[in-house]
């Protein structure tokens, strides 16, 4: 599970699809990395949700406000928001500057810095450290100070790939969770069989993957 020797290459902005649904698929199998003074924490992305333009559950749907301003940055920036008044969650801005859309990172497979993740989430089993958007942000040490961060710099908090691999793994698709509207839309993407996927465990075997 953890591989602190994994060699990662930063993703540049022109590597990222400029489309919310395409980006949600593309990010599967990529890595979210946080370089800390004490070392690196990182996880392989195994679950995402798309919140495209025109979706009423998209936080930018009502227009630009102080709380969602980073969603209108250029694609590849972070939108970090507070949810349920408790947890911060990490989104990747997914459309051209001024548009307002993002992809939520829902789950990671830990690959580096397990000891620091466990220090932030004491008493948590390894399988639950990063299984869910609030859990993974806490495990990686990502809070409101990262809202608006550029994830394409290869420094601080950034997106990476293993070597030059850019093609996502086979994925499955289902409906989003934790929302009250537009619940029928198939905008949640995940790596089938991964024990780190959040929500019901039936997703481990319950839905056939769609090719990437």
Curated annotation (Swiss-Prot):
Keyword DNA damage annotated: yes
This enzyme's EC code(s): 3.2.2.-
GO terms, biological process: base-excision repair
Pfam family name, one: Pur_DNA_glyco
Highest taxon above the source species: Bacteria
Repeat found in the keyword field: no
GO molecular function, one term: DNA binding
Cross-referenced InterPro entries: Formyl_transferase-like_C_sf (IPR011034), MPG (IPR003180), MPG_sf (IPR036995)
PANTHER family: DNA-3-METHYLADENINE GLYCOSYLASE
Family: Belongs to the DNA glycosylase MPG family.
Protein name: Putative 3-methyladenine DNA glycosylase
Keywords, comma-separated and alphabetical: DNA damage, DNA repair, Hydrolase
């Amino acid at each position: 599970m953890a591989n602190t020797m994994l060699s990662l290459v930063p993703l540049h902005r022109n590597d990222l699809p400029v489309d919310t649904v395409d980006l949600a698929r593309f990010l599967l199998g990529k890595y979210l990395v946080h370089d800390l003074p004490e070392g690196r924490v990182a996880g392989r992305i195994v679950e995402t949700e798309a919140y495209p333009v025109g979706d009423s559950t998209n936080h930018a749907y009502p227009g630009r406000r102080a709380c969602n301003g980073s969603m209108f940055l250029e694609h590849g920036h972070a939108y970090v928001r507070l949810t349920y008044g408790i947890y911060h969650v990490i989104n990747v801005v997914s459309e051209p500057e001024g548009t307002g859309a993002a992809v939520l990172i829902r789950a990671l497979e830990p690959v580096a810095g397990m000891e620091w993740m466990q220090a932030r989430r004491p008493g948590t089993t390894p399988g639950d450290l990063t299984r869910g958007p609030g859990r993974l942000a806490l495990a990686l040490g990502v809070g409101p100070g990262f809202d608006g961060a550029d994830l394409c710099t290869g420094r601080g908090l950034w997106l990476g790939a293993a070597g030059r691999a850019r093609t996502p793994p086979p994925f499955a698709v289902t409906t989003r969770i934790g929302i009250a509207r537009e619940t029928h839309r198939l905008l949640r993407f995940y790596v089938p069989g991964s024990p780190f996927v959040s929500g019901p465990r039936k997703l481990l075997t319950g839905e056939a993957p769609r090719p990437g």
